[in-house]
Design a protein with these regions (language model features):
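Low-acidity, Ser/Thr- and Arg-rich intrinsically disordered low-complexity segments
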Residues: 3-8, 12, 19-24, 29-33
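Short, intrinsically disordered or compositionally biased N-terminal tails of bacterial proteins
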Residues: 16, 20-25, 38-46
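Short, positively charged and aromatic/hydrophobic N-terminal segments
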Residues: 33-35, 42-43, 147
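ATP-binding/phosphotransfer module of carbohydrate and carboxylate kinases, centering on a glycine-rich
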Residues: 41-110, 134, 139, 156-162, ...
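Short, basic and Ser/Thr-rich N-terminal targeting/leader segments
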Residues: 56-58, 113, 167-169
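Glycine- and acidic-rich phosphate- and metal-coordinating loops
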Residues: 112-118, 147
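Glycine-rich beta-strand-to-loop/alpha-helix junction loops that act as flexible
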Residues: 116-123, 167-169, 297-308
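Phosphate-binding/catalytic loop of phosphoryl-transfer enzymes
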Residues: 122-220
Length: 346
């Protein structure tokens, strides 16, 4: 039976068109001198550079690409999910990452011909348009394209049947079958779900640690590590902070849980086992809807929780293989930020 949580987008739809716009290569143009008034910006290709961004609830990645498709710089800044931090703050973080990349490559901002930004929290058309307008104002003269984080992740996975699992601050899965039909599930935000995400793992760890303290009168090993490494004097202080800024507090607990799990902490391992099960369920839902279960498909993992914990990676791979035994598990062919840049050029 099809689950209502998944949404179908057929091959003729917007998502397919956006996710496949990454293969065209622009021709190179000659160098010209730019009088920027800064010793750092000496030469730039005439309006040929492209910026690509991958922005989520924790950080933003930016790549600067030349006309031949070569990555000249890769820099990072803070969160740029506009649904969580607001359009103004998201734009500021994108500008920060862009300026770092431009400075590193000694390129002036007015040499940027186009930019593509794959951003979490832009699933609604009105939010996409708000971000597009904001970035168009920040980068006058550049063609601005806004994609969701899932769109650029699917593009970064390459062609053919594939399911992309995004496991970062939030969680979601998107898949494409051999007919080009695309399905997605998850990505509803932490207050509505996003099981297995860094936010979910962090909130589960905090809830468990506080419950154990109430029952035993002392902090568990994991609980002590959470308080110590986050710099809180008490659980009351952590609760106050989490009530005000949950998006800051709970995802920051994930690295602590990950390290504890690799150190064989039983509580941390139990939390991550549950998270792996939640994430594999997302992939299985997409496979059922896209009729991918009988195909030789690739499952691609990406996001901030991937590659951070040996135990979690092993358990997640095992859960995925149980759900889809015939699937292969691998990584993206390029970074989502690079996919966004290539899509913006086409």
């Amino acid at each position: 039976m099809l689950r209502k949580s998944a949404s179908r987008i057929v091959a003729s739809g917007h998502l397919v068109k956006e996710s496949l716009r990454l293969v065209s290569i622009l021709f190179a143009r000659p160098l010209r001198r730019i009088d920027s008034g800064s010793p750092f910006f000496t030469y730039a290709l005439s309006m040929d550079y492209v910026l690509g961004f991958d922005g989520g609830g924790t950080r933003t990645e930016c790549v600067l690409m030349d006309p031949a498709g070569k990555i000249l710089a890769r820099c990072f800044s803070g969160p740029s999910n506009p649904s969580r931090v607001g359009v103004e703050s998201a734009t500021g973080e994108i500008e920060k990452a862009a300026d770092l990349s431009l400075q590193e490559a000694r390129v002036a901002r007015n040499a940027v011909a186009a930019l593509g930004a794959g951003l979490a929290g832009t699933g609604k058309p009105e939010m996409k348009e708000r971000m597009r307008a904001s970035l168009a104002g920040a980068f006058p003269g550049a063609a601005v394209s806004i994609f969701t984080d899932l769109e650029v992740a699917l593009a970064a996975a390459g062609e053919g049947p594939v399911i992309v699992l995004v496991a970062g601050t939030g969680s979601a899965a998107i898949g494409r079958n051999a007919q080009g039909q695309i399905w997605r599930t998850g990505g509803q935000g932490p207050r509505l779900g996003d099981g297995g995400s860094a936010f979910d793992i962090g909130s589960q760890a905090v809830a468990r640690a506080m419950k154990e303290r109430e029952q035993r009168g002392t902090d568990s090993t994991l609980g002590m590590k959470v308080l110590e490494q986050l710099g809180y004097a008490s659980w009351a202080e952590l609760q106050r902070r989490a009530a005000l800024r949950p998006d800051d507090v709970f995802p920051s607990v994930f690295p602590i849980v990950a390290a504890a799990a690799d150190a064989e902490d039983p509580a941390a391992r139990e939390i991550l086992l549950q998270a792996a099960s939640e994430l594999s369920s997302l992939v299985n839902t997409v496979a059922e809807h896209a009729i991918l279960g009988r195909e030789n498909i690739m499952i691609v993992k990406t996001g901030g929780t991937v590659g951070r914990c040996v135990f979690f990676d092993m358990q997640l791979d095992a859960a995925l293989k149980r759900a889809l035994p015939q699937a292969q598990i691998g990584g993206l062919r390029m970074s989502p930020a690079e996919a966004a840049a290539r899509a913006a050029r086409s």
